[in-house]
From Swiss-Prot:
Residues 30-53 are annotated as: Disordered. Pfam families: Oxidored_q6 (PF01058). This is NADH dehydrogenase [ubiquinone] iron-sulfur protein 7, mitochondrial. Its EC number is 7.1.1.2. Hydroxylated ar Arg-111 by NDUFAF5 early in the pathway of assembly of complex I, before the formation of the juncture between peripheral and membrane arms. Belongs to the complex I 20 kDa subunit family. It is a peripheral membrane protein. It catalyses: a ubiquinone + NADH + 5 H(+)(in) = a ubiquinol + NAD(+) + 4 H(+)(out). Binds 1 [4Fe-4S] cluster. The lineage of its organism: Eukaryota, Metazoa, Chordata, Craniata, Vertebrata.
Amino acid sequence: MAVLSAPGLRGFRILGLRSSVGPAVQARSVHQSVATDGPSSTQPALPKARAVAPKPSSRGEYVVAKLDDLVNWARRSSLWPMTFGLACCAVEMMHMAAPRYDMDRFGVVFRASPRQSDVMIVAGTLTNKMAPALRKVYDQMPEPRYVVSMGSCANGGGYYHYSYSVVRGCDRIVPVDIYIPGCPPTAEALLYGILQLQRKIKRERRLQIWYRR
């Protein structure tokens, strides 16, 4: 009967197993020493990156952030689009305003005057002769203003892309926020584009502290 005096195994009596257990204990101690000598044991574990917005560092930033949230909530909940129908896509735009989809439940109400609108839906083929009128209507809209390009013709010319009289995309005349593909896009697609515009407005940050302007 033999007693093995190895660290971690004091007081354990092993019967005839000195030769078999000894190398295992030595190997265990070697592995422990290598693990403790490695660089991973001395460096603390770094926390994982989190996709969370940074907290405001001052009361001023906190107030401005909350005001931004309030203004964005009011703005995205009361979008007033200006109808600028140029071709067959305008029929689907009217379909979205009909009772089946009822865009009024999202706060979207059509206005006849650009001075009362904050969204312009360009639906259809934009020609070179109509481009100045489009820009004039856009300039009459108050800030902040948004543009939704509806259909392939408004996005890039569509079926008439190679025509000499067609503008290859209304974004060459006015800045576009939302592109809706299709020829023509359905009323569901236009409604989805309006919801995406609301999400974009929700993330906007327009207010700034006076000393950071």
